[in-house]
Amino acid sequence: MKKPWKCMALALLSGASLFAAESTKPNVLLICVDDLKPAIGCYGDTFAKTPNIDALAKRSVVFERAYCNQAVCAPSRNALMTSLRPQTLGIYDLGTNFRKSRPEAVTVAQHFRASGYKAQSLGKIMHIGHGNGEDAASWDVPHFHAKTIQYSLKENQTPTREGALFDNKRPDQLPRGAATEMADVADDTYSDGQIAAEAIRRLQAAKSDKQPFFLAVGFLKPHLPFVAPKRYWDMHDAAKLPQPERLTPPDGAPSFAPQFGGELRNYADIPDGSKPLSAELTRHLIHGYYAATSYMDAQLGKVLDELKKLNLEKNTIVVLWGDHGWHLGDHGMWCKHTNYEQATRIPILVSAPGAKAARSQALIETVDLYPTLAELAGLPARDGLDGRSFAGVIRESSVKHREFVTHVYPRQNMIGRAVRDERYRLVEWKKPGAESTTAEYELYDYQTDPGETKNLAASQADVVKSLAVRILAMPEAKPQLKTTAAADASKRPVSQHDRTQMFARRDSNKDGNLTKEEFLTGQPDPKDAPARFTRFDQNKDGILSRDEFVQGGADRTKP
């Protein structure tokens, strides 16, 4: 903790650090929260019970317009750790490790280690599961892992499909688990309580350590399942929580752009496919999300209290980051996995010694955190990153950072590349490498339509053209990297449950049948797919019923 800064004079001259008055390197406490949207008190959500995040906000710069780079766990966390966008890595899935694309990448933790920091990680930092794992090269000590899928009640103790996937085991015929749990248990019964306790132990050890620390603490809630001790459920009156106002996708949106909660529908008490959820179930799930968020907030509070108790607060950069947003029934959608506002807007709070608390309207992206932390700590900048430092915004919250942010999401064999500026979002859907003339567009105007109710691409060609120039100026998105593990996975039989989900995605008009056109759209083997359609069509009526699709292909690997 007492090690003098190297190149202090250079840092002072360049204005590269906020810590000009300090004689020691600042510590870094990076708080990562899984599936946390800005449903937080300090972001104006009056229903949220998040006193500890709100207290942190009072000494932080709160970024009102922060966005992830892809609204799903692994690619978003890759962007955080490497400052490389998913389209740069060519990784959009959960199971492909970023080092398959960039084995030489230096993560933000490695960069701090090279500058004399002790780097440690707890909970969920990189995505663990679905064939992916933690990055041992980033940390000085082995990663502290906690279970993502965890229950307390006896009736929920059976091994589940989702639990197996997050444990990197084959789900086979395991049952689906419960989407929620409310048990009258202690906080440390569930993983976030255990993560907080371990974080406190690491802080206590760091107090007497000669090295500055880079401690990444990843809380799991409010990720599904929504499990939390009963008292956190009791903090919220379910009858008063906000309910979705619109239950259908934006008018004019491409049929493939929305999603209706495939992840949520992997749980036992949720209807299959794209069937709408009842008002009662919707209310219960929203209650669960808010309860799980309050539970996480309480665990975070314990860690921040210990930081202050140990007198480390004044020389520690604290960052709170949500990996992506979450649909809570808006537009009939659940979970993340889209390019829409509710899935892509995230909370980012930065508390830095020497910086004043403020609120910023600057547009920032997840990839920007790596170079920002390096600059705040006085570390040298690294070349080859997609992100750019917003330390200047932390010094003066009114300055601009970017004209627009970018994010992506894959659908079928296409990539949806999006640009979001202060007013609009444009999404370009096309195959990687295809001509821009083949693209299908979505355009939303948040000044006149903050609820994203209508795709304006067809009626505002001039706006589409001006924003498309920004997309065309970007490097082309790489297609998904193919690995041996991914190839092996593609050869495994597809379960009936998964084929039911596939059917729901392909049934674009939601009439309960697939036309040949719906079946063939986006098939990975367009030459062979027509014969497969004919084979599945048992009654030869020219359409596929749900049963024909599910039963006809349940033992096959192609959709």
Model-derived segments and their meaning:
Residues 247, 386-387, 479-489:
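Short, flexible loop/turn segments with low-complexity composition
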